[in-house]
């Protein structure tokens, strides 16, 4: 077992911060189209004693909302990202496949100017329709299967 972290950058300062706190593995957000940056970031992390294992990738709404033909173009891009990550030596890609996404209300502010992501039920408009419309369980699973059928063969 090891200590990992996500959501921090890959600057030398940030990597040294991780090492000082016993973190040996990380994932972060790096442009998945840029193979050279992926490889360089992984090498720089390793030089500081941290293994860059994964990166976060966005899943475009065209995929989660099944908007053809853009969905297939975006899936082609994700397949390219998988290939880049593999060539760069990354273990995987981190993503969130969600039709609705995170439901939030406006941010709240705390001490020292800190910002909190929040959800306050009394401020949430549950009657406002989502762009995805009403989607049943079978349709969601069909969209997930469509995604996985395209990306798993590339990842293997």
Task: Give, region by region, the residue ranges found by the protein language model.
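Glycine-rich loops and low-complexity Gly/Arg-rich segments
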Residues: 28-32, 50-53, 77-81, 118-120
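Acidic-and-aromatic substrate-binding clefts and catalytic sites of carbohydrate-active enzymes
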Residues: 5-13, 28-40, 63, 72, ...
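Short, acidic/polar
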Residues: 7-20, 37-41, 73-83, 144-150
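Glycine-rich, positively charged N-terminal anion/phosphate-binding segment
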Residues: 35-53
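N-terminal small/glycine-rich loop or linker at the start of catalytic domains
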Residues: 1, 50-65, 124-131
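Catalytic domains of carbohydrate-active enzymes, especially glycoside hydrolases
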Residues: 9-31, 44, 48, 84-93
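Active-site acidic/histidine proton-transfer and metal-coordination neighborhood
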Residues: 64-156
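Hydrophobic faces of well-ordered beta-strands that scaffold small-molecule active sites
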Residues: 2-6, 24-28, 52-57, 93-95
């Amino acid at each position: 077992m090891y200590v990992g972290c996500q959501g921090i950058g890959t600057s030398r300062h940030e990597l040294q911060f991780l090492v000082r706190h016993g973190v040996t593995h990380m994932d972060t957000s790096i442009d998945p189209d840029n193979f050279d940056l992926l490889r360089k970031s992984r090498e720089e992390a390793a030089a500081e004693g941290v293994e860059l294992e994964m990166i976060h990738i966005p899943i475009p709404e065209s995929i989660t909302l099944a908007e053809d033909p853009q969905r297939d173009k975006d899936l082609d891009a994700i397949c390219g990202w998988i290939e880049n990550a593999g060539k760069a030596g990354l273990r995987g890609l981190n993503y969130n496949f969600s039709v609705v996404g995170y439901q939030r209300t406006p941010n709240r502010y705390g001490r020292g100017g800190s910002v909190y992501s929040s959800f306050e039920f009394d401020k949430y408009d549950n009657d406002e329709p989502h762009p995805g419309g009403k989607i049943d369980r079978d349709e969601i699973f069909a969209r997930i299967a469509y995604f996985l059928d395209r990306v798993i063969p590339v990842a293997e």
